[in-house]
Amino acid sequence: MKKLSLLAMLTVLIGSALFVTSCGGKIQADTVWQLTKSAGVSVEAQKQYVCFGADGKVIVATKASGTLVKVSLLSGDYTAKGGKIKAPMIAGGVEADYKISGETMKITYNKAELYELKKVSSPTAKEMKAL
């Protein structure tokens, strides 16, 4: 009886840990991220933004002269599941790895950093979708 109780408690504990870990690394729908690094080089001054929509669409935009402009070539359908992401903004259409830690997301391919992004409140997902 004690072994069964211990096994049940261990199962709940491991399940809870997996739930917390998997939820912490998921891309939240309708969030906007600013590109801060590309291939390890700072690009924050270029003001490039990425919106991951709940509808499976990614919108990439740049803020030129104070106006948001959609980058159609890098926008389109995306998938993100289990720490893997596939999106038009990733060259070659490859599936890359992503990891979210707090307000920072890193996208890597073969352990090489492709992008580093930070979550932002402006522009909003609504503004990005209106482009």
Residue ranges and their predicted role:
Residues 111-131:
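C-terminal partner/receptor-binding element of secreted or periplasmic proteins
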Residues 24-26:
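Bacterial signal peptide processing site
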Residues 29-31, 76:
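A glycine-anchored, Pro-Gly-centered beta-turn/N-cap motif
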